[in-house]
């Protein structure tokens, strides 16, 4: 059976590994360390690569291809991986089945400024926005209604934790945030804020074949984000009630962009007007909350695998709406938020695959406030310096 190589070690990759393994697909994990959530899973075989971005990733993928011994399907889990693979697709296509939009479209969709212009051009409903860079001064903010959200154009900075999407309530605050961000990136996008709570944010997860036809599509709703309103998905559920409307917008997007492969769109409904707008796409990779689809009966990674190989895909049955996925045990929905009988599945903890959960708990205890406080008051022996804390890996922000 043709194997699949999943790239990356964070929670996103772990969800993909478990989804593929549940379909009986042999899974390799390309990662630079075993000590990460996906690397500790018993449901994949680890193959070390020197880096998870840039030429180091490309060289690593070419190296492990020889060890695998046959052409494998490749599934990515971060934006920097997509950029590296897209640039090197000519070298990688001999060893991997790649399913990506064209190089030009990857560049457009992954740059927030270019995506804003492209979305407006093809008629996608997106929040009004301006770009601040060397060619556009801060007076451009005057055309926007406050509050706004300020985002680095380079999405890799968000995934790397260098910057985060930030809300600004006044023009002065927006200027301050934009100036700070521009110390790390040359351009920022400033979007008008869409009024609503965490649960007004929905998403679609999909797979397209080489003719830009949607082979599978799942619609979900965020229940908790971290940080609230602007952060990554912490808890989410299926959103069958939104499927028809969001599927139509997703279809328009994939048709116009000639999309190929795995991807996603994030939406937000304006609480007062009811209008739904596209916030941003997930391009060429699995989403942070990808596993919710699998848990509800739509195994997006497994369908992406079969589609990449040109194999037929079985029709998807009824979506199980009595399941919620959460990124960590630290997130607890308020009473009454979820329907009675909803089963919450933790992204890390599984009885049949326990080590990722142990890793999650260990990193939480090592980095939590009580642990930091205790270490301040416990005198460390001079002969045994304290070990470096292991920081918990966070799920990807884009789309998630």
Predicted regions and their residues:
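ATP-binding N-terminal substructure of ATP-dependent carboxylate-amine bond-forming enzymes
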Residues: 1-101, 135-139, 370-398
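Active-site nucleotide/adenylate-binding loops and adjacent lid/helix of ATP-dependent enzymes
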Residues: 108-189, 198, 205, 210-213, ...
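Protein kinase-like catalytic core scaffold
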Residues: 148, 213-215, 275-280
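ATP-dependent carboxylate/phosphate-activation module, predominantly the ATP-grasp catalytic core
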Residues: 169-172, 192-258, 282-308
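A short glycine-rich, hydrophobically flanked beta-strand micro-motif that places a catalytic Asp/Glu
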Residues: 192, 260-272
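Active-site/pore-lining binding-face segments in mid-to-C-terminal subdomains
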Residues: 272-331
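Peripheral (often C-terminal) accessory segments that flank ATP-dependent C-N-forming ligase machineries
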Residues: 305-400
């Amino acid at each position: 059976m043709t194997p699949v190589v999943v790239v990356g070690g964070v929670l996103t990759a772990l969800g993909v590994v478990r989804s593929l393994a549940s379909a009986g697909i042999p899974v390799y994990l390309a990662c630079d360390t075993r000590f990460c959530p996906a690397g500790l899973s018993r449901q994949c075989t680890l193959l070390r690569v020197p880096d998870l971005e840039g030429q180091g990733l490309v060289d690593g993928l070419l190296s492990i291809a020889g060890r695998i011994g046959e052409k494998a399907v490749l599934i990515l889990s971060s934006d920097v991986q997509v950029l590296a693979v897209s640039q090197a697709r000519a070298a990688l296509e001999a060893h991997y089945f790649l399913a990506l939009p064209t190089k030009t479209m990857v560049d457009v969709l992954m740059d927030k400024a270019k995506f804003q212009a492209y979305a407006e051009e093809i008629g996608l409903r997106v929040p009004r926005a301006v770009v601040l860079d060397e060619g556009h001064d801060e007076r451009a903010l005057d055309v926007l209604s406050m509050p706004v959200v300020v985002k680095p154009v380079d999405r890799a900075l968000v995934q790397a934790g260098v910057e985060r999407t930030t809300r600004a309530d006044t023009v002065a605050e927006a200027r301050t945030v934009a100036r700070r961000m521009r110390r790390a990136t040359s351009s920022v996008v400033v979007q008008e804020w869409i009024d609503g709570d965490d649960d007004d944010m929905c998403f679609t997860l999909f797979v397209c074949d080489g003719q830009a036809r949607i082979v599978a599509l799942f619609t979900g709703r965020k229940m908790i984000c971290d940080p609230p309103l602007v952060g990554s998905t912490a808890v989410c559920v299926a959103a069958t009630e939104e499927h028809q409307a969001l599927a139509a917008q997703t279809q328009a997007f994939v048709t116009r962009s000639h999309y190929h492969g795995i991807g996603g769109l994030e939406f937000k409904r304006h609480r007062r007007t009811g209008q739904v707008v596209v916030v941003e796409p997930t391009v060429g990779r699995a989403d942070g909350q990808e596993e919710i689809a699998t848990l509800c009966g739509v195994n997006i990674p497994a369908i992406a695998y079969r589609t990449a190989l040109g194999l037929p895909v079985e029709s998807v049955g009824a979506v199980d709406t009595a399941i919620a996925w959460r990124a960590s045990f630290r997130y607890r929905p308020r009473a009454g938020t979820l329907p009675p009988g909803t089963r919450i599945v933790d992204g890390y903890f599984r009885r049949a695959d326990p080590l990722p959960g142990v890793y999650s708990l260990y990193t939480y205890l090592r980095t939590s406030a009580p642990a930091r406080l205790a270490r301040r008051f416990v005198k460390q022996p001079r002969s045994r310096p304290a070990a470096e804390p292991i920081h918990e890996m966070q799920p990807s922000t884009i789309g998630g």
